[in-house]
Amino acid sequence: MNPFRFGAVVCLSLVAVVFACAAEPPAGAAAISGRVQNAATGQYLNNARVVVKGTDVVAFTDATGSYRLTNVPTGSVVLEVFYTGMAPQQITVNVTGAATIERDISLAGGARYRNDTEVVKLESLVVSSSREMDGAAIAINEQRFAPNVVNVVSADEFGVVPDGNIGEFLKMLPGITMDYRGGDPREISMNGVPSGYVPVTIGGFNLASSEVSGTGRNVELNAVSINNLSRIEAVYSPTPESPGSALAGSVNLVPRSAFERARPVFNGSVYLAARDSSIEWGRTQGPAKEPTFKIRPGFEFSWVVPVNKRFGFTVSGGASTQYVEGPLLLNTWRGAGAATNGTTLPDTTPDRPYLSDFRVRIESKIADRSSFATTADYKLGPASRLSFSFQYGTFHTDFNQRSLTFIVNRVLPGNFSTRFTRGFAGAGEVNLSNSGNHRYSRTFMPTLTFRHDGPVWKGEAGLGTSHAQNRFRNLDKGRFASTLARRTGVTVSFDEIFYLRPNVITVTDGVTGAPVDPYDINSYALSTAGGSPQKSRNTQNTAFANVRRDFDVGFPLTLKAGVDVRQSRSDNRTANTSVNFLGADGRASTTPVGASDDGAGQVYDQDYYQRAGLYGIPRVQWVSNEDVLDLYRSRPSYFTLDENTLYRSQINNSKISRETISSVFLRGDAQFFNRRLKLVGGVRAEQTNIDARGPLNDPTKNFQRNAAGQVVLGANGRPIAIASDPLGIARLTLIDRGAKAEKEYLRLFPSINASYNVRDNLIARAAWYTSVGRPNFNQYSGGV
């Protein structure tokens, strides 16, 4: 959908909602409206139930604590107010004529009211846990009155979350598993469904995410802070409003609102963060070449300001830095988890595996997070509200991964057991591999929402955009992304193997039998190095509008209809640079002995300090990726660069995709048996349009042609080539984003949710729905 059509749909939808809401007929009976709040905290309560006793007139408060009861009989009526965790309250109201009566209500947990003006008496409690207790009450109350299977939790429910990482919060919710990257929970899986099929929104608007591959649908939460949110909604059974791509559910993150509080509230904290393995004052080595601080400060704050009854705003933010160091041992067991080949790696039974590879790896990184958010709410009238929200977040890591690997490669039958492995003479290898990157992610998201909650018509319309950018930088930051130093032609043996690692590792020269020190960098030859800068962008545009109205057809019935347009644009570029080290003599080697000048000692990382005694492994002398790049820049003749491979990498990893999903839905809510049985059902229709570009490999572009455009043939009857060298051929035949893919399809998604109140504290639920798992964008932009 082009921008004009997109804007037209948004404007027409917004106008339709405004006119529908403005066309309400005057109420013919009395009404009672007001707000319900927690007397202790001043927080307005969402989904508090307000009932006119003895009638079927009932209303639930919205996110601002507001309620409105219509068609209230005249005379003296009693309002019954209920909210989980609070003392139920009954309030008498005298209703006269067809006027609207304002009545605000305050509830308190365990408190007793004698009259409306009496001071609230609070029970004894631990002050530090009050926010968590309020959060638990919110979660239970939301689930109690939800029409579908949903888990709504307050951002305060689990207390302080380290560095504001929302993944640390979400992993505690039932049915949700966080996918970890680099030791951080970053992506959401629900009920076993991969993260690429779990829609994530903020306030109902799609959240942009430039995930690592650049072509996936999974949403990374790096730049989202729990400190900027009011609550989290995990939906396990979709309704017609839910996107059709919710295979097992979706997650909506709700920003703070000024109208959630009756009075201004400021919360803030300042702290120092450190890992127990890295409590060191002053600068010490790691993760890169320059020493860094391992104990870092952080802060976070939130300020909610309801200025008056019509306007309010919120401001929140935070920043944190953590140093993380993680050692890891990796064992490769042949016959149990790794395959044998019957020759160099003899076959064995699962009860008698043998160790063929052992790796010592240490990861270290510095992770910086920062976030800022603000919202502004303005009431256009008694029933209409305009809300603006802006979210901004950054995530920056400087990480390194260093590995020492022992490889047997060949073993004879009878020379292994679960306790030892005797490697074949000269067949083994040890190597040092380093990888590191400088990653910077940024996300910003402005949104605007109009809400109307009138006595007859209720409507909502929204417009928002979310932008995310992710960059991996290495060469321009003064380092190679990867290096490899090798020592081949050695004999590797393992002895005294236990569950963690081999207690004794022996490495000897395959020819002389002399011991080789695998922890000394001078035992290795520098082999290869590479750089992989990557830049990916993702934009998500969202526009929606819906209206609903209540009917009484012998039973309570609500109909809701809406439109929804969501656009996604993903743009990814990557270039993989790979060089081979030859040295001054122009000859590559993997053994730094004799006449070889390829010794890795010339790029020894003297500044990096690995803690001694890491699982009993001696201190290792590592390669410096920074020094290797310095050597490459000062002595380029020592290296070879494959220009053809570099060019092909640039083109093959240049991809862009655009997707527009246009939706309409119709939802009906019906209640029976004195509102004990609730049915929610309907259908959603989604039209998907995709336009993608990727690499095009066209061999005919290298054919000579005559003036008429015909291919020129040689004496052998075959086309005559324009270029014969690999790079020349690649530049002619491999075209940047030359492949074009377009796809469109329409899908219907019916659904129904049923709930039955067996008892006041027991609800039975069932749901049936359909959904679709859209493929990775590489399916369209992968090229041909």
Predicted segments, located by residue:
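Transmembrane beta-strands of outer-membrane beta-barrel pores
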Residues: 255, 272-276, 319-323, 392-396, ...
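Flexible glycine-rich, low-complexity coil/linker segments exposed to the extracellular/periplasmic environment
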Residues: 344-354, 417-428, 488-528, 584-652, ...
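Periplasmic N-terminal accessory/gating domains of Gram-negative outer-membrane beta-barrel systems
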Residues: 87, 97, 102-110, 114-198, ...
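Outer-membrane beta-barrel proteins
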Residues: 159, 222, 238-241, 275-298, ...
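Surface-exposed extracellular loop regions of Gram-negative outer-membrane beta-barrel proteins
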Residues: 206, 569-571, 651-655, 720, ...
